[in-house]
UniProtKB/Swiss-Prot annotation:
Keywords assigned: Cell cycle, Cell division, Developmental protein, Nucleus
Disruption phenotype: Flies display a distinct thin-eggshell phenotype.
Cell compartments where the protein resides: Nucleus
Region described as Disordered: 28-48, 311-355
Polar residues: compositionally biased ranges: 315-335
Name of the protein in question: Protein downstream neighbor of son homolog
GO biological process, alphabetically ordered: cell division; eggshell chorion gene amplification; nuclear DNA replication
Keyword Cell division applies: yes
Length: 568
């Protein structure tokens, strides 16, 4: 037994062998670390038989950079000594330094003799810098008026600034209900005896509503060219239902306009926009319509239907004879039917005389037809030159407005069959209720901004803004605030409405001596006839105003109680 125990003790167990191996590795690592720290030897003496030592030595050595490049073989710039003497070497760094502006040398401070009148001279001859000159020019361009002009273009955004707090947009239950009731019933809470709330927040909420038809929540019906409308398909059954609803709504809205129960409304199609206005609005004694933009095909279709129109913004300056012939032809469209039937247009007589003269000279009939077709193409090109521009605006006035209404009601081109919103009727927009209409609401957002070290309260409104919105809000703020300002963004397609109205007011048909009296009388009768149209009396007075600065394109409006309105 003793011999077996001695033999067993000579054998090494596997766990003991592993412990010895690990202990040996730790000793080797410690020795290598000490040798590296003390720099006793420049390089490790590696035993090739020990794999662990080889791995440690490989890790301890510094890895060679594979991208290193020898500086001995580097390329050097060859410099010709003769050229070096003639001109200096221009490098990228020297160009950069040379082109970079440097700070000018400080001016010398020189003390001058005391002048007792120097301070007084500063007040007599003030120095004006470039910013002051720009402010002076802007102040000169701004027009100060006691009233705010009306802008007949549709707005897409409005922002109001005021140093004092603006009306609250977080409404209470009574304020929301009172504003909604006042708008639907066309009431002025301040002038009628009622229990409705008359706070500023309620009145401001009343200004944010308008009526629209049709209303499809998943589509953007103004502007009708919005990106969200791409790929929208309307079925045949839906198209028929929308057309029937729109027909009934358009008829009812136009009847309200003729009865002066609606002051104005917009018809927004894919390719044109129409503004219908009641009698007395914009200085016109009868109901009328403004169409922008128009095309040669549309004007030709109106002529074929016997609808007379005029183009108030059309430029009269013509550069050639073809434009003159077109101007003469366009002016004949505004003549009465009797004048057109009694005598042919002068342009047509001239063309007949020219043809007879060419035939008398023996010109071939084929050549004559070629000349006639060339002349007709030139006339068409001259007539199409102003298509899709503000100058192509059409004015349909008086009894012709009824014919134009029937034309839009039956025209197939009013409802687009292809493209965006195919099959969706034009959008009808009105400040008062009409059949099949849906009430819409502008959502204001308030915030506090800091400009030039001064805190301002701001209200930002995004959406479709009708022309009567700004006069209503301005009337409210002018009563309760000392000063405020507003910036507006207009829809480009409707700028021609304000331009045409302004030009029609500046060129009256009556003589200058009788114009002022008739304008004042027309304004009074217009306000009286539109007293039941559903708008506030101050707003009715602004849209019926015919004096100076009655209409204008508004981008920025400032108000101070002592000076009035300044706008540009």
């Amino acid at each position: 037994m003793s011999t077996e125990a001695s033999v067993a003790s000579k054998w090494t167990r596997p766990d003991d062998f592993i412990k010895l191996q690990r202990l040996k590795q730790k000793k080797n690592k410690l020795a290598a670390r000490v040798s590296n720290n003390n720099n006793r030897r420049p390089r490790h003496q590696v035993d090739e038989t020990d794999k662990s030592k080889l791995l440690e030595a490989k890790l301890a050595q510094k890895r060679k950079n594979p991208f290193a490049k020898s500086t001995a073989d580097a390329k050097k710039l060859r410099v010709d000594p003769q050229l070096a003497d003639l001109e200096p070497v221009v490098t990228a760094s020297s160009c950069f330094v040379r082109e970079t502006p440097t700070r000018p040398a400080p001016a010398k401070f020189v003390l001058q003799k005391y002048d007792p009148q120097a301070f007084a001279k500063l007040f007599q001859h003030p120095q004006i810098n470039a910013e002051d000159e720009d402010d002076a020019e802007l102040a000169a361009r701004q027009k100060h008026t006691a009233h705010l002009p009306v802008d007949w273009s549709l707005k897409t955004r409005a922002r109001f600034f005021c140093p004092t707090e603006l009306p609250a947009i977080q409404l209470k239950t009574s304020q929301l209900a009172s504003g909604l009731t006042s708008f639907v019933r066309c009431m002025d809470p301040q002038r009628t005896e009622s229990t409705l709330d008359i706070s500023d927040a309620t009145r401001f909420n009343q200004c944010n509503y308008y009526w629209q038809h049709p209303h499809l929540p998943w589509l953007t019906l103004y502007p009708r060219t919005a990106k969200e409308n791409v790929g929208v398909v309307v079925g045949e059954r839906e198209r028929k239902a929308l057309a029937e609803e729109w027909d009934f709504s358009f008829r009812g809205l136009f009847q309200l306009l003729r009865a002066r129960q609606c002051p104005y409304f917009y018809l927004c199609a894919n390719t044109f926009t129409v503004l219908f206005r009641a009698a007395g609005v914009g200085g016109r004694p009868e109901s009328h319509a403004l169409v922008t933009p128009s095309t040669r095909g549309m004007r030709q279709a109106l002529r074929q239907e016997g609808i007379e129109f005029s183009m108030p913004l059309k430029s009269d300056n013509s550069g050639n004879a073809h434009d003159n012939s077109f101007n003469e032809e366009s002016t004949t469209t505004s003549l009465g039917p009797e004048a057109g039937e009694d005598a042919p247009p002068p342009a047509q007589e001239d063309e007949d005389d020219d043809e007879d003269w060419l035939e008398s000279l023996g010109v071939d009939e084929r050549e004559l037809r070629r000349i006639q077709s060339s002349h007709a193409r030139k006339q068409q090109a001259a007539e199409m030159r102003e298509d899709f521009s503000d100058n192509s605006l059409l004015l349909v006035d008086g009894v012709e407005c009824q014919g134009f209404f029937s034309y839009l009601l039956n025209a197939k081109s009013a409802i687009s069959t292809v493209g965006r919103l195919a099959g969706v009727p034009p959008t009808l927009l009105s400040p008062v209720a009409f059949p099949k209409a849906t009430m819409q609401h502008l959502v204001p957002r308030s915030k506090k901004v800091r400009l030039d070290g001064v805190d301002y309260f701001s209200i930002d409104i995004k959406g479709l803004i009708l022309p009567t919105f700004l006069p209503s809000v301005a009337e409210l703020l002018s009563e309760t605030r000392q000063m405020f300002s507003s910036t507006l963004a207009s829809s480009i397609n409707t700028l021609a409405f304000s331009k045409a109205t302004q030009k029609l007011l500046e060129t009256p048909e009556t003589p200058q001596s009788d114009a002022e009296g008739e304008d004042a009388a027309g304004q009074v009768f217009g306000e009286q006839n539109l007293s039941e149209c559903g708008l506030l009396p101050a707003v009715v007075g602004s849209i019926c105003r015919t004096g100076q600065h009655a209409v204008g394109l508004l981008e920025r409006v400032c108000y101070q109680r002592d000076e009035g309105y300044a706008w540009s």
